[in-house]
Amino acid sequence: MYVILLDNNRTNILANPVQREILYCIRCGACLNVCPVYKNIGGHSYGTTYSVPIGSVITPNMNGLEEYKHLSYASSLCGACTEVCPVKINIHGLLLDNRHASVEQGMTTFSEKMAWKIWKLASLKRGLMNTGNGTLKSKVVNKLFKDWNKYHTPLEFSKKTFNEQWKERKHE
């Protein structure tokens, strides 16, 4: 008689006090039913055995964070999955933990880091956010986030800024 034990990196997950929680998953699918990302794009686009959102936590831990880190970014972090989970897994918290781990392990490119710094600066300074039209912003941002666009549709900005749209509505 032979006994084959298939671990699939579960021992390493069990050793991590934060990520251990994902092993409690009973694969009931409650998180899938409430996930807005899953509702819009389905599970096949993720290309893994475990579907989102719990699969976005499990897969990088089982099959390697470097190859599957993008799954942790495929979430709106609304928290609906955590609310409905019958075993109370903090799914959106674990997604954030995976994102943090990928940054800490240096898995982000220089251009990605710079793009987020520019985005932060523009978000903090309203004048910068209003500079340029939507077409120009779309081209610049999509160029900066070209790695992001491997897994997502390119970003497309509105032709008018939020402030312009707000002023138009205010005068109506």
Segment roles from a protein language model:
Residues 25, 29-32:
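Phosphate-binding glycine-rich loops and their immediate beta-loop-alpha structural context
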